[in-house]
From Swiss-Prot:
Gene behind this protein: ureG
Family assignment from sequence similarity: Belongs to the SIMIBI class G3E GTPase family. UreG subfamily.
Name of the protein: Urease accessory protein UreG
Gene Ontology MF term list: GTP binding; GTPase activity; nickel cation binding
A single GO BP: urea catabolic process
Annotated residues for binding of GTP: G11, P12, V13, G14, A15, G16, K17, T18
Entry keyword Nucleotide-binding: yes
Description of how the protein assembles with itself and partners: Homodimer. UreD, UreF and UreG form a complex that acts as a GTP-hydrolysis-dependent molecular chaperone, activating the urease apoprotein by helping to assemble the nickel containing metallocenter of UreC. The UreE protein probably delivers the nickel.
């Protein structure tokens, strides 16, 4: 496929970006050809995690070492990621969907619209109930927003109801969901959004 759909996955360090990709790819790779690009500052740790998980052959996963601000590599100067896309397509010209995981960054990080067609931004409950209230372009402008690790809410004193209300204030009608990726809670909602809104399944 000459022009695969590209979905960016952004969010702070430890929010669950790599785990989200692992879970989603495990489901979707049964029915379509997928590639993954990971961004890390000085290592290829996330690439190794995905390779070791076995969700895709190693040749379908490329790790990019950004060597600086991870935000720059997905927006102002995305040349390394464009090169990785080209390399993936040289290896597998049938790829229909590419996930591009950003390095862990702040709430302001967004993807260049030239690099990705859609973006998902993920945070986790342990970062605090106030995070959705802070806004941030990553959360506000992403096509889909995820609040992960709902199981931790009682331990950090976070109200999921309040987080939902604050999210609606900043995102309006843009979709979001809660997840506990450890148990796959909420994963169906993420898959449904990808299939319906990015792959346009069920539309005719």
């Amino acid at each position: 496929m000459a022009n695969p759909i590209k979905i960016g996955i952004g969010g702070p360090v430890g929010a669950g970006k790599t785990q989200l990709i692992e879970k989603v790819v495990k489901r979707l790779s049964k029915e379509m050809s997928i590639g993954v690009i990971t961004n890390d500052i000085y290592t290829k740790e996330d690439e190794k995690i995905l390779v070791n998980s076995g969700v895709l052959p190693e040749s379908r996963i490329i790790g990019v070492e950004t060597g600086g601000c991870p935000h720059t590599a997905i927006r102002e100067d995305a040349s390394m990621n464009f090169a990785a896309i080209d390399e993936l397509l040289e290896r597998h010209d049938d790829i229909e969907l590419i996930f591009i995981e950003s390095g862990g960054d702040n709430l302001a990080a967004t993807f260049s619209p030239e690099l990705v067609d859609f973006s998902i931004y993920i945070i986790d409950v342990a970062q605090g109930e106030k995070i959705p209230r802070k806004g941030g372009q990553g959360m506000i402008k992403s096509d889909f927003f995820i609040i992960n690790k709902t199981d931790l809410a009682p331990y950090v004193g976070a109200s999921l109801e309040q987080m939902a209300e604050d999210t609606k204030v900043f995102r309006g009608k843009r979709p979001f969901t809660f997840t506990n990726l450890k148990t796959d809670e909420g994963l169906d909602e993420v898959i449904d959004w990808i299939e319906r809104d990015t792959l346009l399944k069920g539309l005719s």
